[in-house]
Amino acid sequence: MTRDRELQALLRLTAWLSPAFPIGSFAYSGGLERAVADGLVTDAALLAAWIGTLVGNGSVWNDAVLLAESHRQQAEAARLAEVAALAEALAGSRERHQETMLLGEAFLAAARAWPDEVFRRLPDKVAYPIAVGAVTGAHGIRPEKALAAFLHAYVSQAVSSGIRLGVAGQRDGVAILAGLEDHITEVARRAAASTLDDLGSATVQADIASLRHETQATRLFRS
């Protein structure tokens, strides 16, 4: 039975963080589109560095810390509300706020196909990492696994965005995914042991790119 539960958890995690899960993440680049337009990301190597830095030291790291906290607090409605408010406040731009809130709303709507009391405990609208953390925690998925899948999904989407923006090819994209595996693993483990005191980022260029994207005239992405 234990093995069956582990397989069930794997199937659910795979479904929830699959590109096919209907949350619309393909519409967002998290400022990457502006970074490409500004010449900050021009090839596959720079794309890999950009993504890796965000995962380890940027907004994605903060998302991982918030996910871990909501995973721990999934049974406490009051604590979930507090961390949800914090996650929303940490969104560094209008588009970043829109992105994380709409993804969170879409994730919860789709994840209700797997009924659980956690949906009653969560606020109606929450940031994406809060939604993922609370739902995976409620379904007994280990935090390291939830975090690794969440980070891998982000990297995959960012790579896809880079390909669509013309700074990398498909083989480059696969190589980036392979090359960032160890980094994803390390960050997932670090985030699983984190507390809210570990929140913080050092990716000023990425934050500025996210802000500048708001006034970009020609765009493929919503952020």
Curated annotation (Swiss-Prot):
Residue ranges that the Swiss-Prot or TrEMBL entry lists as coiled coil: none
Localization per Swiss-Prot or TrEMBL: Cytoplasm
Keyword presence, Cytoplasm: yes
Record keywords, A-Z: Chaperone, Cytoplasm, Nickel insertion
Highest taxon of the lineage: Bacteria
Function of the molecule: Required for maturation of urease via the functional incorporation of the urease nickel metallocenter.
Protein name as annotated: Urease accessory protein UreF
Gene designation: ureF
